Amino acid sequence: MRLNTLSPAEGAKHAPKRLGRGIGSGLGKTGGRGHKGQNSRSGGGVRRGFEGGQMPLYRRLPKFGFTSRKAMITSEVRLSDLAKVEGDVVDLNTLKAANVIGIQIEFAKVILSGEVARPVTIRGLRVTKGARAAIEAAGGKIEE
């Protein structure tokens, strides 16, 4: 086997449709578009969501909800992520320095997911009840 003898398996490749190349091709003259009408024209067709003039679904259904702007700057931190932080004190800046949270994050909450291996001091972060118990069991403490 040589590079110049390699070829795709039989039937793996399909020849492209060659439109408008004579009556014998089966796709000559109208090129598979039929006769007349909007879709036979160049640039023909309707926009996405158009239902022929009927009130479209996206306008029939009511608007609902909103996106909380605070959610965009809030993040959850797993207990297992605390191991990535250098030092014993964990706060917003040390989490950002360790790339645990993004730089745009302003609020963080430590949640019970994974395990905390060493005693750490949590400063200025919110902590769930389960995470608080796990941190204190490991010898750490939480400062508000």
From Swiss-Prot:
Family from the record: Belongs to the universal ribosomal protein uL15 family.
rRNA-binding as UniProt keyword: yes
Disulfide bridge partners, by residue number: none
GO cellular component: cytosolic large ribosomal subunit
Domain of life from the UniProt record: Bacteria
SUPFAM superfamilies: Ribosomal proteins L15p and L18e
Keyword Cytoplasm: no
Name of protein: Large ribosomal subunit protein uL15
Gene Ontology MF, one: rRNA binding
Compositionally biased region (Gly residues): 21-31
Pfam families: Ribosomal_L27A
GO biological process, one term: translation
HAMAP family in the record: Ribosomal_uL15 (MF_01341)
Region of interest (Disordered), residue spans: 1-53
Complexes and interactors: Part of the 50S ribosomal subunit.
PROSITE patterns (UniProt xref): RIBOSOMAL_L15
InterPro entries (alphabetical): Ribosomal_uL15, Ribosomal_uL15/eL18, Ribosomal_uL15/eL18_sf, Ribosomal_uL15_bac-type, Ribosomal_uL15_CS
Keywords recorded for this protein, A-Z: Ribonucleoprotein, Ribosomal protein, RNA-binding, rRNA-binding
